[in-house]
């Protein structure tokens, strides 16, 4: 048994010692069978939440009314969820109620896709009542039961299906794809925040080229923020090298450029992204326009952007052009390391020095003067020493006075 499961065996065994059933379930079991890196290990049990909390000394009630308790075991947190069935779904988003049951199969039956409805016992025996292993072998995403019913229960499952295409490289089964086309309008019931979470995972997957056209083909695009008029560009966006990007800001910047978004901020705000992400994606695209070619970075532009943003700019450019960015990254690192200063805080002078030298009250001119100083320093026009900067500034002022 793989280490992530071995580390959680103590929870399974404790539950079984007290007469309860307990199994590993969900994405960890799926990823084990696929051969992917295993993430969080989840456990399903016949024990009720209050029974779970009695059996373990350190638990966190994160949703006991829905059956979930976090058990902290040997320093690691595990979600332990009681077998349950879901009641009728409210607004195609969430069940109005849940009913705790004692049957593993009933619990697995409520899950979205067959590959996620597989369990494993403490000996490593696989329990697969809905054909999840066959779907994995055929590299297909199939729903548990009728696809139409699953998507009417929770419309976000349609977006999850396409996201799994991006993450796993699997295809949608014919029934799954057909049901998404039929039920795509139900996405109108889903919050933007939930859509954004799935979209970010989709854009980060290694098989984005297969997933993006599916958003267009299934009609999901029409219910995603800002995409209703972008169907052809969405298909074309599959041609870019998305897997070369490592940061969410880079992916959103590439999406904006791929979709020819003119006004970036409203588009990204519609996805309810954090301001920090919006600002950075916008700054990446602005720098991409200001520096037309990788070899055309000036010292001033490199300093203003900072190394991390400059590297992101070249990563996005590489993804757009299909040319590897590593050689340009190495050159940017070398050039940035050679800059006399890396931040404005490293300047040998500050605003107080400038005010004292000028002998006049503070005002907007102070920032303008400091900006002129750092530009002169990074372009090697003057050394970053207080005396030399003072002399340079006095000469600059004399020249300015003569010209006036």
UniProtKB/Swiss-Prot annotation:
It catalyses: a tRNA precursor + 2 CTP + ATP = a tRNA with a 3' CCA end + 3 diphosphate; a tRNA with a 3' CCA end + 2 CTP + ATP = a tRNA with a 3' CCACCA end + 3 diphosphate. Pfam families: PolyA_pol, PolyA_pol_RNAbd, tRNA_NucTran2_2. SUPFAM superfamilies: Nucleotidyltransferase, Poly A polymerase C-terminal region-like. Its EC number is 2.7.7.72. GO terms for molecular function: ATP binding; CCA tRNA nucleotidyltransferase activity; magnesium ion binding; tRNA binding. Its cofactor is Mg(2+). Gene3D superfamilies: 1.10.110.30, 1.10.246.80, 1.20.58.560, Beta Polymerase, domain 2 (3.30.460.10). GO terms for biological process: RNA repair; tRNA 3'-terminal CCA addition. ATP binds at residues 27, 30, 111, 154, 157, 160, 163. Mg(2+) binds at residues 40, 42. Keywords: ATP-binding, Magnesium, Metal-binding, Nucleotide-binding, Nucleotidyltransferase, RNA repair, RNA-binding, Transferase, tRNA processing. It comes from the Bacteria. CTP binds at residues 27, 30, 111, 154, 157, 160, 163. InterPro entries: Bact_CCA-adding_enz_type3_sf (IPR050264), CCA-adding_enz_C (IPR032810), CCA-adding_enz_firmicutes (IPR023068), NT_sf (IPR043519), PolA_pol_head_dom (IPR002646), PolyA_RNA-bd (IPR032828). A single active site specifically recognizes both ATP and CTP and is responsible for their addition. Catalyzes the addition and repair of the essential 3'-terminal CCA sequence in tRNAs without using a nucleic acid template. Adds these three nucleotides in the order of C, C, and A to the tRNA nucleotide-73, using CTP and ATP as substrates and producing inorganic pyrophosphate. tRNA 3'-terminal CCA addition is required both for tRNA processing and repair. Also involved in tRNA surveillance by mediating tandem CCA addition to generate a CCACCA at the 3' terminus of unstable tRNAs. While stable tRNAs receive only 3'-terminal CCA, unstable tRNAs are marked with CCACCA and rapidly degraded. PANTHER family: CCA TRNA NUCLEOTIDYLTRANSFERASE 1, MITOCHONDRIAL. NCBIfam families: PRK13299.1. Homodimer. Belongs to the tRNA nucleotidyltransferase/poly(A) polymerase family. Bacterial CCA-adding enzyme type 3 subfamily. This is CCA-adding enzyme. It comes from Geobacillus kaustophilus (strain HTA426).
């Amino acid at each position: 048994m793989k280490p992530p499961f071995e580390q959680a065996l103590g929870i399974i065994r404790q539950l079984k010692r007290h007469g309860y059933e307990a199994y590993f379930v969900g994405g960890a079991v799926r990823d084990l069978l696929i051969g992917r890196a295993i993430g969080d290990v989840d456990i399903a049990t016949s024990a009720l939440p209050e029974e779970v909390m009695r059996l373990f000394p350190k638990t966190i009630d994160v949703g006991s009314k829905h059956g979930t308790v976090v058990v902290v075991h040997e320093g690691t947190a595990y979600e332990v969820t009681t077998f349950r069935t879901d009641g009728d779904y409210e607004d195609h988003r969430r069940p109005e109620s849940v009913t705790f049951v004692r049957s593993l199969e009933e619990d697995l039956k409520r899950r979205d896709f067959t590959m996620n409805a597989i369990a494993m016992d403490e000996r490593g025996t696989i329990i697969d009542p809905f054909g999840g292993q066959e779907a994995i072998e055929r590299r297909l995403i199939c729903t548990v039961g009728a696809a139409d019913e699953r998507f009417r229960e929770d419309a976000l499952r349609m977006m999850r299906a396409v996201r799994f295409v991006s993450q796993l490289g699997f295809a949608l089964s014919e029934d799954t794809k057909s049901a998404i086309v039929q039920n795509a309008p139900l996405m109108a019931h889903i919050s933007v925040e939930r859509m954004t979470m799935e979209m970010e995972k989709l854009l980060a997957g290694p098989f984005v080229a297969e997933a993006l056209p599916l958003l267009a083909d299934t009609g999901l695009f029409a219910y995603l923020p800002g995409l209703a008029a972008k169907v052809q560009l969405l298909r074309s966006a599959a041609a870019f090298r998305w897997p070369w990007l490592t940061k969410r800001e880079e992916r959103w910047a590439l999406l904006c450029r791929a979709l020819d978004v003119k006004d970036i901020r409203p588009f990204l705000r519609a996805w309810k992204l954090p301001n920090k992400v919006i600002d950075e994606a916008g700054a990446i695209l602005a720098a991409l326009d200001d520096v037309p070619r990788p070899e055309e970075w000036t010292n001033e532009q490199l300093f203003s952007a900072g190394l991390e943003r400059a590297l992101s700019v070249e990563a996005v450019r590489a993804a757009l052009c299909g040319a590897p960015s590593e050689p340009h990254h190495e050159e940017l690192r070398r050039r940035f390391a050679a800059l006399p200063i890396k931040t404005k805080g490293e300047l040998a002078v500050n605003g107080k020095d400038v005010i004292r030298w000028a002998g006049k009250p503070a005002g907007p001119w102070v920032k303008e003067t400091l900006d002129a100083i750092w530009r002169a320093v990074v372009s090697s026009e003057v050394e970053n020493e207080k005396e030399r900067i003072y002399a340079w500034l006095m000469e600059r002022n004399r020249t300015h006075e003569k010209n006036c």
